[in-house]
Amino acid sequence: MAPAESGVSPRRNPSQLSWMNLSSNLILAYQSFGVVYGDLSTSPLYVFPSTFIGKLHKHHNEDAVFGAFSLIFWTLTLIPLLKYLLVLLSADDNGEGGTFALYSLLCRHAKLSLLPNQQAADEELSAYKFGPSTDTVTSSPFRTFLEKHKRLRTALLLVVLFGAAMVIGDGVLTPALSVLSSLSGLQATEKNVTDGELLVLACVILVGLFALQHCGTHRVAFMFAPIVIIWLISIFFIGLYNIIRWNPKIIHAVSPLYIIKFFRVTGQDGWISLGGVLLSVTGTEAMFANLGHFTSVSIRVAFAVVVYPCLVVQYMGQAAFLSKNLGSIPNSFYDSVPDPVFWPVFVIATLAAIVGSQAVITTTFSIIKQCHALGCFPRIKVVHTSKHIYGQIYIPEINWILMILTLAMAIGFRDTTLIGNAYGIACMVVMFITTFFMALVIVVVWQKSCFLAALFLGTLWIIEGVYLSAALMKVTEGGWVPFVLTFIFMIAMYVWHYGTRRKYSFDLHNKVSLKWLLGLGPSLGIVRVPGIGLVYSELATGVPAIFSHFVTNLPAFHKVVVFVCVKSVPVPHVSPEERFLIGRVCPKPYRMYRCIVRYGYKDIQREDGDFENQLVQSIAEFIQMEASDLQSSASESQSNDGRMAVLSSQKSLSNSILTVSEVEEIDYADPTIQSSKSMTLQSLRSVYEDEYPQGQVRRRHVRFQLTASSGGMGSSVREELMDLIRAKEAGVAYIMGHSYVKSRKSSSWLKKMAIDIGYSFLRKNCRGPAVALNIPHISLIEVGMIYYV
């Protein structure tokens, strides 16, 4: 059989495949400049001024400048080049990077999650099996120790939230620091520009940056990579020019002997200056956090071939210039730029600062969405700004909060050195946390020895600890800002997670017994009404208490009932083919099903608006699959709760016994409106006539029908499918709990503060669950419930 006939594409030779991989990685490497390296590449604007501020001004000499450059060179080599490129980029979660990716890996390979909604079926997800299978992972004593102690698992969650809150702090500090630093060049050439005028211009740029976030960056994203590349090439040649013109001997400073000499001369003052040196690697975490948009090869190529050499040459050239112009340290970058190219470089620097700020803002949105997916952030509005670029999101509430805080930083400090102190602490803390989780991954996921993990952790913590300790010395000089921001965001995230856990625990312990459910019938005055009732809860098993409340207050429920649970699993993405997990709750005559809708922590929830039709198709496929199972007849008379199957609505379109057709129904204007004398109704009539001159309203409606091949199925299966179709035609109602969560009277004062004040405030001021799930308001039934947790 020919390849075309068999459906198998012709095999490509190895040279073709290698060329395709090379070209693909080169394209991704090019695109990564605008997303990953914007922040890191603008560091030369403020590193040397921040390093030589404070007591180090007493050591303004050539040896100190050479030593500072040597420190910057080895910092760039050890942290971005060795730690991130060689080690961390190998620890991805299905291609995703960042602290949450490492935590997700740990949650899959060890039972670290505090929310007990995991199921065995989740482990069958294709993304779940990435890396060593959980079936083959040997239960090490360290892993068992973590799983047994809830306090340790809580501590791990707190560390993750601490890191996430620090990243949010980066989203506040980076725009203020980058924009102010790029604009500082105006004062180098225009002496009459005051600090106040510079601040006003910076605020205008910052307001414009945040105000345009709702438009999405995809319209101008194609410019991001060229801007950063032009910036890197510019600073490379400026650095090369300064080396040749001012002091070619600076090349010798790559030797670590200059670091020893530097500390021997400067002593404690030199150690404190490390808080400025670490600014040379701010933005490095973006190489790992944005891994999901690229490949590890593309990020490695971009950094090793372009970014690293350009930054090293620029810092070397700036140091060569400063060694002969010690008075230019406060504005070292712009003073080192040759006059003929000053204005082009100034424009490119400002644009590069905006690109770097944009990348950090986008990362902040992504981190908050991941926190929300893991149940650690209140429900917020997530707007997807691009139909073509997956994961490009905008969060209005967070955007305006970031803008207000960023403006407060710029106006309050007015000094890039103070903001740099805060920014350096935030970045180094995130790196510190990433190193810690990487060590855990080495033991738990990679199954390497604890000695190797301890060696990795100890080596990097010693290096990073030196920088962090120096940065912490500047807490009183602006360094307190990231801790205040982190404390606020972390408290909000943990309180929300704690309240969510307690609420889930209440639901779990107050599930309705199956015996009660089986006893529902006409003898109790219960009526089954036409339609499908979707009962939403967070329970993945059992019948939620809101259903009993609903039936108690309104003794009727729908002919078809589906208990729906929308939950997140510790993987970045769940494919549409694996999204729906369908099962049966009661014997067949009850027409009760369970649907678990699974999303990854980076997935988009219900964006297509076709949830009802996908659900009906999946249930129909489940009924068909169950009928073909020879063992199903043996268990038909008993409860099938707990038996779940993965169903694909996409697959059912081609193989299902249901056919889907879209019909256009025509509704005519109500005759009561036409004959009424009411002014209001008459105005409505005029609206109808303007929009539909014929008095017709056209509506699209999806209908399901059994295929011709369904005649061979059993009568009971056909009847069940017809009941499902008729119920869908009758309409779909959404039943949700309107919850009031309160602490018990016997609770401690701390718990009362967390639940009655903190969680209650967040719940009242966040989006409702119905809005977050895009549930049509006209079809919503809310059942009031009080949760005493």
Curated annotation (Swiss-Prot):
- Residue ranges in the Extracellular topological domain are 54-68, 176-195, 241-270, 322-340, 414-424, 472-478
Q: Which InterPro entries match?
A: K+_transporter, K_trans_C, K_trans_N
Going by the UniProt record, its keywords in alphabetical order are: Cell membrane, Ion transport, Membrane, Phosphoprotein, Potassium, Potassium transport, Transmembrane, Transmembrane helix, Transport
Which positions carry Phosphoserine? 9
What triggers expression? By potassium starvation.
Job description of the protein? High-affinity potassium transporter.
Similarity comment: family membership: Belongs to the HAK/KUP transporter (TC 2.A.72.3) family.
Protein name (Swiss-Prot/TrEMBL):
Potassium transporter 4
- What organism does the UniProt record list as the source? Arabidopsis thaliana
Lineage of source species? Eukaryota, Viridiplantae, Streptophyta, Embryophyta, Tracheophyta
